[in-house]
């Protein structure tokens, strides 16, 4: 399902899954085989694959590959559903902050549970799961293109310009973080293809350097005019007047719009507010967690101290003094009051004029109602 490409993070054909080892980019392009949920868990935890949409799809497909090989399974449909549910719960534990993974697992668990109530053959449970996981892969690409289209058009209207828009992005939110095209980087791609992007700036995104290793790699590959900056140069860039907007992705968005994203996003939002630069979040609806009233309830993953103590995001030589303690959160939470709008595949979520807050629940309900009418 998809041809092998330099910027394709997930290469899947039924019964086979290969993941691009993003730790080795941009100097080496290497794919690893994933044959079971255990392989998928390790690939996600070790950041072979990363990006909230991509890890959800990689997890779902890892289990799809595993169950496709269970031809000798002799259990009941209920036992097959229980097997799938247990594996999904295990996969969710690989990276807890990104809601896409837990959301996908919840939907897939519900599917196999319902299927088990009507099917008499356990293999039908596995087949239903495989079909659903494959649909998620296809839908992600189309959703990302819709995010790009909505975002580019909204920025053009909001900034009241028809060309020469320059933006700053953080971390990696492109083809390498999704099944294809990207979220925040998808908006940048849409701006570029529409002939209205002057330049994209990307941060290096320490300590794992997703910006310098991955986003810069994608932008160069697509021949998008781009400049890499140090994380610490972002405020100076905004002060210079060289950019009109910041566009980032999201790992989890609370009901009020508070957004968890790669560490350093909060810094950018504060700087953007100070300098009068618009700040956008681009993410699929699956990144929104309406069960959380605010960002205070979002669990923040902490990564290995080695990512700071050693070069190359922990994979290289020691660069810090032995004995120093380390605090290395993978994400931070940007308050909704610092966010201009949230760009989704269903449209752009804006704030009400009355109280300058997001009403995300109503937006999602309206989007679902509209979809049922099509």
Curated annotation (Swiss-Prot):
Subcellular location(s) of the protein: Cytoplasm; Nucleus
E.C. number(s) listed in UniProt: 5.3.1.23
GO annotation, cellular component aspect: cytoplasm; nucleus
Keywords: Amino-acid biosynthesis, Cytoplasm, Isomerase, Methionine biosynthesis, Nucleus
One GO term (biological process): L-methionine salvage from methylthioadenosine
Domain of life: Eukaryota
One MF term in the entry's GO annotations: S-methyl-5-thioribose-1-phosphate isomerase activity
Family matches, as Pfam families: IF-2B
Site (Transition state stabilizer): 171
NCBIfam families, sorted: eIF-2B_rel, PRK05720.1, salvage_mtnA
Name this polypeptide is given: Methylthioribose-1-phosphate isomerase
Organism: Oryza sativa subsp. indica (Rice)
Upper taxonomic lineage: Eukaryota, Viridiplantae, Streptophyta, Embryophyta, Tracheophyta
């Amino acid at each position: 399902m998809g041809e092998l490409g330099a910027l394709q993070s997930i290469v899947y054909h039924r019964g086979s899954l290969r993941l691009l080892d993003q730790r080795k980019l941009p100097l080496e392009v290497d794919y690893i085989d994933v044959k079971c949920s255990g392989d998928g868990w390790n690939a996600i935890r070790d950041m072979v694959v990363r990006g909230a949409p991509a890890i959800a799809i990689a997890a779902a497909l890892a289990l799809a590959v595993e169950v496709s090989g269970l031809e000798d399974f002799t259990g009941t449909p209920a036992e097959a559903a229980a097997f799938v549910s247990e594996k999904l719960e295990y996969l969710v534990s690989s990276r807890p902050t990104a809601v896409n993974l837990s959301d996908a697992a919840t939907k897939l668990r519900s599917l196999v549970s319902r299927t088990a109530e009507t099917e008499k053959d356990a293999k039908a449970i596995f087949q239903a799961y495989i079909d659903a996981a494959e649909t998620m892969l296809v839908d992600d690409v189309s959703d990302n293109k819709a995010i790009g289209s909505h975002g580019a058009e909204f920025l053009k209207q909001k900034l009241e310009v028809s060309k020469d828009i320059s933006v700053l992005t953080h971390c990696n939110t492109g083809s390498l973080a999704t099944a294809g095209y990207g979220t925040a980087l998808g908006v940048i791609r849409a701006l570029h293809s529409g002939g209205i992007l002057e330049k994209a700036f990307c941060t290096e995104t320490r300590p794992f350097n997703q910006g310098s290793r991955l986003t810069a790699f994608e932008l160069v590959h697509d021949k998008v005019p781009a400049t890499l900056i140090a994380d610490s140069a972002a405020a100076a860039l905004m002060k210079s007047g060289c950019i009109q907007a910041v566009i980032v992705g999201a790992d989890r968005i609370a009901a009020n719009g508070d957004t968890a994203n790669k560490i350093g996003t909060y810094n950018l939002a504060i700087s953007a507010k100070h300098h009068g630069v618009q700040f956008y979040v681009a993410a699929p609806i699956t990144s929104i967690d309406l069960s959380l009233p605010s960002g205070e309830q979002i669990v923040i993953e902490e990564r290995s101290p080695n990512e700071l103590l050693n070069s190359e995001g922990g994979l290289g030589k020691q660069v810090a003094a032995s004995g120093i303690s380390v605090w290395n959160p993978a994400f931070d939470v940007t308050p909704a009051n610092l966010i201009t709008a949230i760009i989704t595949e269903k449209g752009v979520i804006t704030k009400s004029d009355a109280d300058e807050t997001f009403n995300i629940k109503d937006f999602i309900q309206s989007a679902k109602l509209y979809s049922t009418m099509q």
